[in-house]
């Protein structure tokens, strides 16, 4: 396997790692963290509003993580067999745009509400993910053009 395909394989593994990290962090926050412990339920709201919020967060996380797994697995398959389909480049581009949008929203939140350790960690995660998606796209296009 040449260097370009090895780099594509490495970035595919990193993207799968980010997807696993996202799932683990959300599950730990929901079931072990204190993210929902201090929520005040407004009057007239159903009693199970916190459970509904947790379910919604799990669904959003699942929808967010599925393209990451697809891009990572498909990129690894293309690194092994360059003649397979090329839909992973489009989805990596979509994830790259979402990472940029997330960084922009994090910076906007930091400007409006002040900085915190959570906002810095979210910003750093966004930068790292955006760089990995960009590099993934670069190497996937090189593999597509070479084979």
Model-identified regions with their sequence ranges:
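Juxtamembrane transmembrane-helix termini
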Residues: 28-39, 74-84, 108-115, 138-146
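Hydrophobic transmembrane helix segments
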Residues: 17-66
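Loop-to-transmembrane helix junctions at the membrane interface
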Residues: 67-98
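Physicochemical signature of membrane-embedded alpha-helices that form the seven-helix bundle of GPCRs
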Residues: 10-17, 21, 53-63, 87-97, ...
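Cytosolic juxtamembrane helix and N-cap/initiation of the first transmembrane helix
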Residues: 1-31, 48, 142-147
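Alpha-helical membrane-associated segments of multi-pass integral membrane proteins
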Residues: 12-14, 98-102, 108-142
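Juxtamembrane loop-transmembrane helix junctions in multi-pass integral membrane proteins
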Residues: 2-9, 41-55, 79-86, 90, ...
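Cytoplasm-facing ends of alpha-helical transmembrane segments in multi-pass membrane proteins
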Residues: 64-73, 133-143
């Amino acid at each position: 396997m040449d260097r370009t395909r090895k780099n594509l394989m490495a970035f595919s593994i990193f993207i799968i790692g980010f997807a696993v990290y996202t799932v683990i962090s959300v599950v730990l926050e929901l079931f072990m963290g204190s993210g929902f412990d201090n929520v005040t339920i407004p009057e007239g709201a159903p009693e199970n509003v916190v459970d509904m919020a947790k379910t919604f967060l799990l669904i959003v996380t699942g929808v967010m993580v599925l393209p990451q797994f697809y891009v990572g697995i498909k990129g690894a398959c293309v690194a092994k067999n360059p003649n397979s389909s090329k839909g992973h480049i489009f989805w990596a581009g979509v994830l790259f745009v979402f990472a940029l949008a997330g960084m922009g929203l994090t910076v906007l939140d930091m400007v409006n509400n002040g900085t915190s350790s959570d906002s810095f960690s979210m910003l750093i995660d966004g930068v790292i993910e955006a760089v990995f998606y960009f590099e993934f796209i670069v190497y996937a296009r090189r593999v597509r053009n070479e084979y």
